[in-house]
Swiss-Prot record:
Protein name: ATP synthase subunit beta
Gene name per UniProt: atpD
Disulfide links within the chain: none
Any matching Pfam family: ATP-synt_ab
Family: Belongs to the ATPase alpha/beta chains family.
Catalytic activity: ATP + H2O + 4 H(+)(in) = ADP + phosphate + 5 H(+)(out)
Amino acid sequence: MKGIISQVMGPVVDVDFKDYLPKINEAIEVNFTVEGNTHKLILETAAHLGDNRVRTIAMDMSEGLTRGLDAIALGSPISVPVGEKVLGRIFNVIGDLIDEGEEEKFDKKWSIHRDPPAFEDQSTKSEIFETGIKVVDLLAPYAKGGKVGLFGGAGVGKTVIIMELIHNVAFKHSGYSVFAGVGERTREGNDLYNEMKESGVLDKVALCYGQMNEPPGARNRIALTGLTMAEYFRDEMGLDVLMFIDNIFRFSQSGSEMSALLGRIPSAVGYQPTLASEMGRLQERITSTKKGSITSVQAVYVPADDLTDPAPATVFAHLDATTVLNRAIAEKGIYPAVDPLDSTSRMLDPQILGEEHYKIARGVQAVLQKYKDLQDIIAILGMDELSEEDKLTVDRARKIEKYLSQPFFVAEVFTGSPGKYVSLEETIAGFKGILEGKYDQLPENAFYMVGNIDEAIAKAEKMRA
């Protein structure tokens, strides 16, 4: 059905139809020419203004659009390619390839606006999602089909953890991952693509990018594009998929820009009045069903370090676990720089993990907390002033700290150490031994950058030789 553009206000475009009214979220296509180049622009219907006029949000730059241009209603929402063919490729918000690779014909396409799975289809089992990363599996384990927040400043290693998770899911669980770059820097997206290519995980992951320079419509809907691809793997192929959203804050931020452009009255701190429901719609689709699961890791930017800001506060309500990266730990050379005391998980429960895992996790945290409390005394008076018991606690805490480091597969290029995947059983056994004092005689450097505890013992013997 043909309409005519009646008004262009940046990323917001009004279209008049004669005897047809596009539904909310229906896609509308506009073809126009700028300086001899033909452009295709997709608009998404956002509001009905009366008299068959609709207000739409542009999914790309609207420079060169003029009033009077023809706009064709496509009769359905934006649909994007799904299935195994999407692996190893980069898509934009409307599902077009943007990686300069060869053109591909996609026979399967799904609408990006979908209902979350029905209650009776959802799985209520609490299962642990083994990542092979010691610090995560022991202290803040991920739930299968759960949502994890990855908090950290610039350069602390968020991207490396994301790539390691993609690697471990691909090689240990032979699973697929989907990465949605929401309001990302183009450079970071490019780096991620090249690093994945080098580390050999690219053919197990689909990438969807809506970069920082794009209009708010593209930055907002790109999260749904990625999620739709992940849903296909879960619902049609019965797989356990890993879904990365970097950065979930930009999803709320672009929603707030769209809301203002559409003329809605803002709520707290200028955010859209529908912030909680938009976030809920996205997050409710990320879940476990009886067929498969989507486990999501979402990087969360906290504006001005204010955790009470409505955008991060809305995300918190949905998270099952938080992985907090700490610059102070990275400065000690301990990678992954996950803070063992700040990271949390609802899975840390004896009924889910079992008594032994829970006891050891809490024991490790208690030793590290005691060490933290003693640090002021050590700084002022030195180790000699501590009681024998405290000296032993400090010694074990330093070993635990070192043992929480781990060589990553995707970091082999710059560490020179082969990556290690440590199973949950090995992780628990290793930390249990340290807490019980089995390895008190080993030097603490033997625990640095190793996989399981046997490697630490072998390293200690090598150091003695």
